[in-house]
């Protein structure tokens, strides 16, 4: 699994621990200005793999390291839940713009390319892309200047991959939720679907919300 350090990624990692004996995780800490250094260090220390999203070489190194750790990659879960930047446009530090683009937009394209190459060569595998459909406040956050842009890019990437999924030898699925604060249930829902996944699910978008358990 790879993704932003967030309530969503923590819930998915916790569910992963309960379901598998061995996994590999690369989490992106919030490196925006004002983020507590101790939190960045804590996230970096507990992840099993290092990843610099701005580097295509790092994406390849990450997948090689994951294969060495796990022997092979059967399933990859990518989680985009970018941090918020609540600031007047004129006051946003240029460094934060660069970090947001590198960590929350550009890196996903590099990593998806590497994973797709692995799954294509093996002619099997599951690529799951996960994102929230709303902000962490539970409604669209108009005060967040850059977070929604990063999320929109990941959503568009997901939609493109799902549209092309039927021509690929591996399975690509998407997951989104509109139930902020219920990340634990969403994580359980994701793994319930993945546990039962088949080729018929190729290109499908699974949406978690109030009525998901009745689908």
Task: Place the predicted regions along the sequence by residue.
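Canonical Rossmann dinucleotide-binding motif of NAD(H)/NADP(H)-dependent dehydrogenases/reductases
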Residues: 1-35
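Short, aromatic/basic amphipathic alpha-helical patches
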Residues: 11-15, 34-43, 149, 153-161
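Residue-level signal for alpha-helix termini/capping positions
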Residues: 16, 67-68, 120-121, 166, ...
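Hydrophobic/aromatic beta-strand patches that form the interior of the parallel beta-sheet core
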Residues: 23-25, 47-49, 77, 128, ...
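Conserved mid-core segment of classical short-chain dehydrogenase/reductases
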Residues: 46-71, 78-103
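Conserved internal alpha-helix within the Rossmann fold of NAD(P)-dependent oxidoreductases
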Residues: 59, 73, 107-112, 183-186, ...
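Catalytic loop of short-chain dehydrogenase/reductase
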Residues: 81-111, 117-166, 176-179
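C-terminal helical subdomain
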Residues: 152, 163-215
């Amino acid at each position: 699994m790879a993704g932003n350090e967030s309530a969503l990624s923590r819930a998915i990692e916790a569910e992963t621990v309960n379901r598998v004996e061995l996994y590999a995780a690369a989490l992106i800490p919030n490196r925006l200005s004002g983020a507590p250094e101790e939190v960045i260090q804590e996230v970096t220390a507990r992840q099993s793999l290092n990843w610099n999203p701005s580097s295509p070489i790092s994406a390849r190194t990450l997948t090689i390291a994951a294969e060495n750790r796990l022997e092979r990659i059967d399933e990859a879960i990518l989680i985009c839940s970018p941090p918020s930047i609540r600031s007047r446009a004129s006051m946003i530090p240029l460094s934060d713009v660069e970090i947001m683009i590198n960590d929350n937009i550009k890196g996903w394209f590099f990593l998806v390319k590497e994973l797709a190459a692995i799954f294509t060569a093996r002619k099997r595998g599951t690529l799951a892309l996960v994102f929230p459909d709303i902000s962490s406040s539970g409604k669209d956050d108009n005060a967040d200047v850059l977070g929604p842009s990063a999320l929109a890019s990941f959503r568009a990437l997901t939609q493109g991959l799902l549209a092309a999924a039927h021509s690929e030898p591996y399975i690509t699925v998407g997951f989104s939720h509109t139930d902020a604060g219920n990340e634990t249930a969403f994580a359980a829902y994701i793994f319930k679907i993945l546990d039962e996944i088949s080729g018929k699910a190729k290109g499908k978008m699974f949406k978690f919300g109030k009525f998901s358990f009745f689908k």
